[in-house]
Structures are given as structure tokens and as C-alpha cells.
Regions:
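Structured, helix-rich domain cores that form ligand/interaction pockets
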Residues: 1-329, 347, 356-395
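Membrane-inserting effector segments that mediate pore formation, membrane fusion
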Residues: 330-343, 348
Length: 395
């Protein structure tokens, strides 16, 4: 069975791309997947080169003397040639302090950040270990032959298969959403009363940035088609990247508990960090599985057939993010509404003989092995580059 999925644009609604999903038998040993089919994207991942980078890192340093931020900034920029954004913490008279947060954009390596730390230690002295306040990792996918269509299809697939372990629904600001230009974000999921109607879900737009998680969350994901750089939103200007530099990008910003999950608290912790761990924790992609159509037609319970049909349609339109919203609504109903229904039955002298959670939408998801493996490979390459840089520094 073939499913052709439309991939819409936000800024030019008349424009449309598409990608195909092939529904085919799944070969899996896990009991819950036996006899099921998988919706597999028709996309040759070998047509892309993936590269992982540290997009930026924010560290906090405690110096041995009181100074102003511009002196720290000048020292780093003049001697190491690294642009940085510095903020004094707990500043006193003359905006002077001993504690500063320093954000380094696109640092060459962790080893280079350690060089920054050494420079500040020599120049100002250090009274405590340098801590990591936040960090952003990116994985970029470049078509081997520059192509708008190749990027559009890969992004459309990523938007539908990205899987987040975070709670995206308790905090309304964390909900999966799309943003473009200066417009208000458009949420992927509908009002909860329409959770079982795929027509009320919003399909991700190819020329929008897709967010999972709030700006202030400890973990936030972003997906985009990166075709511009050095954007100035206030002036409405940007530089269009050359075709060979245009790529699909997925970013994860970590702070607080997000850093703790990868074992990072201090800058020194990053020397032994496992970069490949990021794939399993954050850069995770999953595919939807469904019973074969002949099995669906033979199911005696119409509810089960309806559930499978709706899940398939939501996945194809709004992806895993849409499915997990529907599951959130379903669980909310079980927690809040079902006890009242059971109490009502009890008061009427009746009872529900069997109470089961059943198979959830999350249970029907399986790892997108091909994409996950390529992301892991890109992260391993990053880890190897970092190890070489540390070795050259003598660390």
C-alpha cells in the first residue's frame, strides 16, 4: 500500500511538495510487532551526508579578581579570535563582577573552550571549576547533490518521525508548534475535543521552524530547512546560503536536567562525554506500525479498526507528535473521566468486568533504524573530532 503525503509551505501556500510512505510487512521479533506493517518512507538516506556540530555553549566562570565584562570579552576576542557574548552575574558598582556567563558561538571544539578557560585563569585567576550552563548540538543533513526536493522530502520525513521523551503537554508553551516570520506559532495538535479527528491537526510546514519544548525547558528540539544565515529579524534581512551549504537541520538545546542526563555539569565533564548518547536521548526517530489491512478488516471490534485507521491518518499528516498528543488526551480521559464512569456503573449496580489500558499509539511506534544509525554515525564522527582536538591540546 502506497501513501503519498502532501508537504505544505507556510509562506507560499500555493507551493506543494510530497513524500511517499510505503506500507509493508514488518520483520520484527518483538511480540507487539509480530504480523504488523510499517509505514516506511520512500527515501534513500544514502543520498545525504550528515554532520554533527556543537552550535554554541554557555559556560559560567568565577574569576579571582573583580572586573568588567568588556575586559573579559576583549581578552578572548583579541587573543583567541573568538566572538563571544558575556554577561556579568551579580554585578556591583560599575557593572563589575567576578562571575560571568560566556556564550561561545560555533566553538571549534571542546578543547578550544578549555583554551578559553586557561586564558582566563592566566589573566584573571579562577576560584572555582567552570560550569556548563547550556549547550546546543546540531545534526545537519546535506544532499550529496544539492537539491530542494531532496531537502524537502527529508525534512517532511523528519517532521513526522521525530520522537521526544519530554512532557510536551503539561506546559502549553512546550507543545509541538510551527513558527515562521514574526507570526504567532501554529500548534500541530488541535483542541483536545478534536483529538480523534485527523482533519483538525496541522501538517508541519516545510518553510517553518518546528519546535518541541518551551524556550525555557531543560530540553528543546528544533527542526528546519536551513537555507539562510546571519538573519536580522529586526531589519528583515538575511543571507541566502549557497546551494551546497543548504541543509536540513535538527537542534537540541540542553540545560539543567537535560545536561544532567548526558553527565555534564562542569566543562571538565565534556572531556569524557559520550556524544553518541545524544541520539538515544534526543535525536530519536520512530515509524508507525499498523495491522495488515486484511487483519483490520477481520477484526470483530469496530473500535479497534477505527483506532488503527485514525492513528495511521494522524501519523501521515501530523507525525509522531500528533499521535502522542492523541495518546495524551486518551490517558487524560482514563485518569479523569473513567473513574466517574465506573462510579456511575457501581451506583447502578453494574461493573466493568475487564479494565485494560490496551495497545497505545506509543506501543505502535518502532525505531527508524536507517535514520537513527546515520545520526549516531554523525555523532560518533563529532566525538572522534573532539577526542583528536583534546589529544592535540595534551588533555
Amino acid at each position: 500500500m502506497i501513501h503519498i503525503v502532501d508537504l505544505p509551505f507556510a509562506k507560499t501556500p500555493q507551493r506543494l511538495a510530497d513524500v511517499t510512505f510505503h506500507e509493508k510487512p514488518l520483520r520484527a521479533k518483538q511480540t507487539r510487532f509480530v504480523g504488523r506493517s510499517v509505514l516506511q518512507p520512500v527515501l534513500d538516506l544514502d543520498n545525504f551526508n550528515l554532520k554533527a556540530v556543537i552550535d554554541w555553549i554557555e559556560i559560567v566562570v568565577q574569576l579571582g579578581k573583580v572586573t568588567q565584562f568588556q575586559h573579559v570579552q576583549r581578552k578572548i576576542e583579541d587573543e583567541l579570535g573568538q566572538k563571544c557574548f558575556i554577561k556579568a552575574i551579580g554585578a556591583g558598582a560599575g557593572n563589575a563582577s567576578q562571575t560571568f556567563s560566556i556564550r561561545l558561538q560555533e566553538p571549534k571544539s571542546v578543547a578550544f573552550v578549555l583554551e578559553v578557560e586557561r586564558l582566563l585563569d592566566v589573566s584573571f585567576g579562577m576560584t572555582a571549576a567552570t560550569t556548563v550552563n547550556a549547550i546546543e548540538f546540531s545534526v545537519d543533513a546535506y544532499p550529496k547533490i544539492p537539491s530542494d526536493r531532496a531537502r524537502e522530502q527529508l525534512l517532511g520525513v523528519m517532521q513526522r518521525t521525530i520522537f521526544s521523551r519530554e512532557d510536551l503537554y503539561t506546559n502549553p508553551n512546550a507543545r509541538p508548534r510551527l513558527a515562521w516570520d514574526n507570526s504567532s506559532p501554529k500548534y500541530i495538535q488541535p483542541h483536545r475535543m478534536h483529538a480523534y479527528n485527523e482533519r483538525h491537526y496541522t501538517a508541519p510546514k516545510l518553510d517553518a521552524t518546528m519546535y518541541l519544548g518551551a524556550e525555557a525547558d531543560d530540553v528543546m528540539l528544533r527542526l528546519m530547512d536551513k537555507i539562510i544565515d546571519t538573519q536580522n529579524k529586526a531589519e528583515g534581512t538575511a543571507v541566502t546560503l549557497e546551494p551546497e551549504k543548504q541543509r536540513v537541520r535538527i537542534e537540541v538545546t540542553l540545560q539543567g536536567s537535560g545536561l544532567k542526563r548526558i553527565g555534564v555539569a562542569t566543562l571538565a565533564d565534556m572531556k569524557a562525554m559520550s556524544f553518541t548518547r545524544l541520539q538515544g536521548e534526543f535525536f530519536t526517530f520512530r515509524l508507525f506500525t499498523t495491522p495488515p489491512r486484511n487483519q483490520m478488516l477481520s477484526q470483530t471490534k469496530s473500535g479497534a479498526r477505527y483506532e488503527d485507521k485514525i492513528n495511521r491518518e494522524i501519523f501521515l499528516k501530523a507525525g509522531v507528535a500528533g499521535l502522542l498528543f492523541k495518546e495524551h488526551v486518551r490517558k487524560s480521559w482514563r485518569v479523569n473521566a473513567k473513574p466517574l464512569a465506573l462510579l456511575n456503573l457501581k451506583n447502578r449496580g453494574r461493573r466493568l468486568k475487564v479494565l485494560r489500558d490496551g495497545v497505545t499509539a506509543a506501543d505502535q511506534l518502532i525505531a527508524y533504524k536507517g535514520l537513527n544509525e546515520r545520526v549516531t554515525r554523525a555523532l560518533r564522527d563529532l566525538e572522534n573530532r573532539e577526542r583528536r582536538a583534546l589529544k592535540s591540546l595534551g588533555v
